[in-house]
Amino acid sequence: MQSTLTRALALAIALAASGAAEAASTTFINPVGPATYSSADPFVLRHTDGNYYFVATSENWDKIELRKSASLSGMGVSAPVTVFTKSATACSGNNCYSKDVWAPEINYINGAWYIYFSASGSDDQHRVFAIKNTNADPTTGSWTTPVKVADTDDAWAIDQTVATINGQLYMAWSDISGGQPQRIKLAKMSSPTAIIGRGAIVSTPTNAWEQVGAKVNEAPQFIVHGSKVHMSFSASGCWTDDYKLGLLSANLTADLLNPASWTKAASPLLQQGNGAFGPGHNGFTKSPDGTEDWIVYHANPASGRGCTNYRTTRIQKITWNGDTPVVGAPVAVGTAVTRPSGEGTGTIWYRIRNEHSGKVVSIDRGAPANGAQIWQFADFGNTDQRWSLDPVGSGYFKLTTAYNGNVADVYNFSTAPGAYVKSYPYAATTNQQWILVQTDTQYFKVRNRNSGIMLDNKDGSMLDGGVIQQWTDNNLAPQHWLFERTN
């Protein structure tokens, strides 16, 4: 067993180093969408009631689910409310919503809630639709039957967004018409469900980086800063790793329906990097205190995933170069990100679920607190099954239990495969420090800093009480762990 002297020395080192690492209460990790399934085409609205309202394309493209959250980084935690389901009977024509329910967006306009989305019938004639709810809380009350929202062309349309700019309501969307590729169309609206006349084409995929896989401009989103209005858009095929964001900019006082008013940035606003493939289809929102701008987008965790259910929602803070937004490279998943300003400092808790067994990391509460075996058990919501990720520097975390404040510790500083993981007070030693390693799904591998090997469900146990150990990396399901945020 670890000697008292070794423990005392480690504790002294810990006290000397205290305060150097950022506390878990001030950080979160991406992805932030629902932990157990995908969340492509995310959109988040920060409302005046202090809540965030989150929608995304559902896995089966068959419904719209709405989540309400008091925090931006915790938007994927709450249970979803289904507010729309595709029509049960297949149909054809340009007035159908029996399949391909894509890219919902929620807005609050003139005292009512609207969710816009695109859908189609059996002949893939995609159009934009809107549903309305007059209840104060959109997760309650009823939503109206969908109404089609189209300009006079009434052509193929997806990925709509609406915004009020200088007192005028606009809609932008992705259009295919006249034998042309996907382009961005923009129009004024006379009401939240009525477009005035014919939309103007304001962006066409002309750059090489907009043409990977296909010539595509889609998923426009507005953000206003100072004297400029910007419109981000997604470029290239979503089925490629090179799906990315571009940026259009115009003077706030310009005629926005004049294509000449818009200037396209020569380089992408956001593209693949740091293990994020095909980042795109974004939204913009504010921090809880309104002082920061944040971008919300989806990306894949591995190459070749395309427009599938591997896409997850990520967020990161925007900075500004004058009135021009700067996003930078995608933030790597599983790394500590400072929480949005005004979000609070309450500890963020996770359940850590094993991919192989479906059980969660727990502590043998019948054993003495110091040295108690860490094992897996069915999730009962107990405090020994809730863990915080506390950054300790260089990308590493300590895994702290809500049960008694102890941390996950590789017993006796072992570097050998098969060494047990136990519960001990934190002493700032490397056998108590772990880094999250991205896999090709939402699961992580968890590597110990001291030994360099992985957190492991011993022998792939399916049983309650299955021992948690460390083992050489084999990239199998007993070494894959899902961090499911619980608050």
Predicted regions and their residues:
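N-terminal signal peptide c-region/cleavage motif recognized by signal peptidases
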Residues: A17-A21
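Generic, low-specificity signal for short hydrophobic/alpha-helical stretches with a mild N-terminal bias
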Residues: L5, S25-T26, V229, A266, ...
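Carbohydrate-active catalytic/glycan-binding domains of CAZyme proteins
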Residues: A24-G346, N431-Q433
